[in-house]
């Protein structure tokens, strides 16, 4: 039989973690002063007058560089538990991790050839 009382802690955590941000937004909305003016609408740059436009558009190559970084950062997250339990796991898990790394190396070579890693 499926017992719902086993998940009471989960539901309590879910409710509390949902109520706290909602309360924070409600309290700040009620207590915050509403003073609209030119000072509020201007952008802030370390206490000095802003030079140029506040909204700059980044080139797409920065996004591609960041995307390649995120892919290999996630690779590290996936390989860390495997490295910590390497002595307990068998050879088959080593082969699986090797295949995983080889697939990522193929992706790196592909990104390199497409010019995603070119900075200039």
Curated annotation (Swiss-Prot):
The keyword Transcription does not apply. It is an enzyme of class 7 (translocase). This is NAD(P)H-quinone oxidoreductase subunit 3, chloroplastic. It catalyses: a plastoquinone + NADH + (n+1) H(+)(in) = a plastoquinol + NAD(+) + n H(+)(out); a plastoquinone + NADPH + (n+1) H(+)(in) = a plastoquinol + NADP(+) + n H(+)(out). Disulfide bonds: none annotated. Belongs to the complex I subunit 3 family. InterPro entries: NAD(P)H_OxRDtase_bac/plastid, NADH_UbQ/plastoQ_OxRdtase_su3, NDAH_ubi_oxred_su3_sf. Its EC number is 7.1.1.-. Its main location: plastid. It is a multi-pass membrane protein. The chain crosses the membrane at residues 9-29, 64-84, 88-108. NDH shuttles electrons from NAD(P)H:plastoquinone, via FMN and iron-sulfur (Fe-S) centers, to quinones in the photosynthetic chain and possibly in a chloroplast respiratory chain. The immediate electron acceptor for the enzyme in this species is believed to be plastoquinone. Couples the redox reaction to proton translocation, and thus conserves the redox energy in a proton gradient. It is found in: Plastid, Chloroplast thylakoid membrane. GO terms for molecular function: NADH dehydrogenase (ubiquinone) activity; quinone binding. GO terms for cellular component: chloroplast thylakoid membrane; NADH dehydrogenase complex. Keywords: Chloroplast, Membrane, NAD, NADP, Plastid, Plastoquinone, Quinone, Thylakoid, Translocase, Transmembrane, Transmembrane helix, Transport. It comes from the Eukaryota. GO terms for biological process: photosynthesis, light reaction. PANTHER family: NADH-UBIQUINONE OXIDOREDUCTASE CHAIN 3 (PTHR11058:SF9). The lineage of its organism: Eukaryota, Viridiplantae, Streptophyta, Embryophyta, Tracheophyta. NDH is composed of at least 16 different subunits, 5 of which are encoded in the nucleus.
């Amino acid at each position: 039989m499926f017992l719902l009382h086993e998940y009471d802690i989960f539901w309590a955590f879910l409710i509390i973690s949902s109520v706290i941000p909602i309360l924070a937004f409600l309290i700040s909305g009620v207590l915050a002063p509403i003073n609209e003016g030119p000072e509020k609408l201007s952008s802030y740059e370390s206490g000095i007058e802003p030079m140029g436009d506040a909204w700059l558009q980044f080139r797409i190559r920065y996004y591609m560089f960041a995307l390649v970084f995120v892919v290999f950062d996630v690779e590290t997250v996936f390989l860390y538990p495997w490295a910590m339990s390497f002595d307990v796991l068998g050879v088959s898990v080593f082969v699986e991790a090797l295949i995983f790394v080889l697939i990522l190396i193929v992706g790196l070579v592909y990104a390199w050839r497409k010019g995603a890693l070119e900075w200039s």
